[in-house]
């Protein structure tokens, strides 16, 4: 999964400075995946499993707020889980309302410009927390994202821990610098 480059570089520097650093200590530098569409990662156990075993799964939720507008509540979604298509999400919500699987929604509209803004207008008598929980349950506003830290090691695919990935990266960089230096000396 994508990560914040600054956090990854900080983690690499931490491993170089302290070769005995544990995964828990490394997680203070590399806190978890950083998805471009945002979303909220629910819990740390999935990240911890992925970083310690090379496999894990995380639950991503859309970032949504309940607002009051003209004596009615509405749910405003400002971030969606990674790889979720906003237009398909809106269409799916409308289908669920039409089929009667989710009650309390009067309309949806996409007010996005530069940033995501999906507005879900609620009926007057609707409980916004119940509607929001149903949206998480029945739509991709809550999604599971599997993590496999897979890389080629000696031309063979191998599942690595976070620490092993960083160690292989550092070894690769040392090899590149050694070869470049030897090439320059041989000129």
Residue ranges and their predicted role:
Residues 2-187:
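C-terminal interaction appendages of subunits in large macromolecular complexes
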């Amino acid at each position: 999964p994508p990560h914040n480059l600054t956090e990854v570089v900080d983690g690499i520097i931490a491993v170089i400075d302290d070769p005995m650093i544990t995964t828990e200590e490394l997680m203070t530098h590399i806190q978890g995946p950083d998805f471009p569409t945002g979303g909220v990662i629910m819990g740390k156990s999935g990240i911890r499993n992925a970083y310690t075993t090379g496999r894990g799964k995380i639950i991503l939720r859309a970032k949504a707020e309940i607002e009051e507008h003209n004596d009615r509540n509405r749910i405003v979604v400002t971030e969606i889980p990674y790889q979720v298509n906003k237009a398909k999400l809106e269409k799916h919500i409308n289908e669920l309302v039409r089929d009667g699987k989710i009650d309390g929604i009067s309309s949806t509209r996409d007010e996005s410009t530069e940033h995501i803004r999906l507005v879900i207008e609620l009926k007057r008598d609707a409980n916004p927390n119940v509607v929001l929980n149903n949206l998480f349950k029945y739509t991709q506003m809550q999604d599971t994202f599997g993590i496999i830290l897979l890389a080629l090691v000696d031309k063979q695919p191998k599942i690595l821990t976070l620490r092993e990935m960083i160690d292989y990266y550092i070894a690769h960089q040392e090899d590149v610098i050694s070869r470049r230096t030897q090439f320059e000396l041989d000129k």
